Amino acid sequence: MLAALQTAALGAAAGHGAVNSGDIIFQLVAFILLMLLLRKFAWGPLMGVMKQREEHIANEIDQAEKRRQEAEKLLEEQRELLKQSRQEAQTILENARKLAEEQKEQIVASARAEAERVKEAAKQEIEREKEQAMAALREQVASLSVLIASKVIERELTEQDQRKLIEAYIKDIQEVGGAR
C-alpha cells in the first residue's frame, strides 16, 4: 500500500503540475484506507494504553492523597500523644515536687521530735546525775560530820568518860544479845 502511495506521488511529480483526478482519488482512497487501518490497529490500542495510563495516574493520585491524609492523621495523633506525654510528665514532676516537700516536712518534723527527745533525755540524765551527786555529797557531808563529831567527842571526853561509854555500849549489846 505504501508502495502504491509512493508511485502515485512520483507520477504526480512527473506530470509537472497537471492535476490528475485519478491520482487524487487514489490518494484520497489510500488516505481513508490508511486512517481506517490506523484506527483499527493503532488508534484502539493506543487509546487503550492512554486510558490505562490515565487510570494508573488517577489511581496513583488517589493513593497519594490517601497516604497524605493518613500521614496527616498520624501526625495529628503523634502531636496529641506528645501533648499528652508532656502533660503526664508535668503531672509527674508536680507530684514529685509535692512528695519531696511532704517528705522534707516529715523529715524536719521527725528531726525536731528526735532533737526534743534527745534534749529531754539529756535533761533527765543531768537531773539524775545531779541527784546522785547531791546524794553522794550528802553522804560525804554526813560521813564528814560523823567523823568531825567523833573527833570532837574524843577531844571533849576524858578517858574515864570514854570507858563508861564503852562499858555502857557493851552492856547494851549484851542485853540485846541476851534478849534474843
UniProtKB/Swiss-Prot annotation:
- Name the source organism: Geobacillus thermodenitrificans (strain NG80-2)
Quaternary structure, per UniProt, is:
F-type ATPases have 2 components, F(1) - the catalytic core - and F(0) - the membrane proton channel. F(1) has five subunits: alpha(3), beta(3), gamma(1), delta(1), epsilon(1). F(0) has three main subunits: a(1), b(2) and c(10-14). The alpha and beta chains form an alternating ring which encloses part of the gamma chain. F(1) is attached to F(0) by a central stalk formed by the gamma and epsilon chains, while a peripheral stalk is formed by the delta and b chains.
Taxonomically, the superkingdom here is Bacteria
Q: Does the keyword Zinc-finger apply?
A: no
The terms describing its cellular component in GO are: plasma membrane; proton-transporting ATP synthase complex
The subcellular location is: Cell membrane
Its family?
Belongs to the ATPase B chain family.
**Its membrane topology, per UniProt?**
Single-pass membrane protein
Protein name, entry field? ATP synthase subunit b
According to the record, the segments passing through the membrane are: 18-38
Protein purpose: F(1)F(0) ATP synthase produces ATP from ADP in the presence of a proton or sodium gradient. F-type ATPases consist of two structural domains, F(1) containing the extramembraneous catalytic core and F(0) containing the membrane proton channel, linked together by a central stalk and a peripheral stalk. During catalysis, ATP synthesis in the catalytic domain of F(1) is coupled via a rotary mechanism of the central stalk subunits to proton translocation. Component of the F(0) channel, it forms part of the peripheral stalk, linking F(1) to F(0).
Keyword annotations of the record = ATP synthesis, Cell membrane, CF(0), Hydrogen ion transport, Ion transport, Membrane, Transmembrane, Transmembrane helix, Transport
Gene3D superfamilies associated with the record: F1F0 ATP synthase subunit B, membrane domain
Any one Gene Ontology MF annotation carried by this entry is: proton-transporting ATPase activity, rotational mechanism
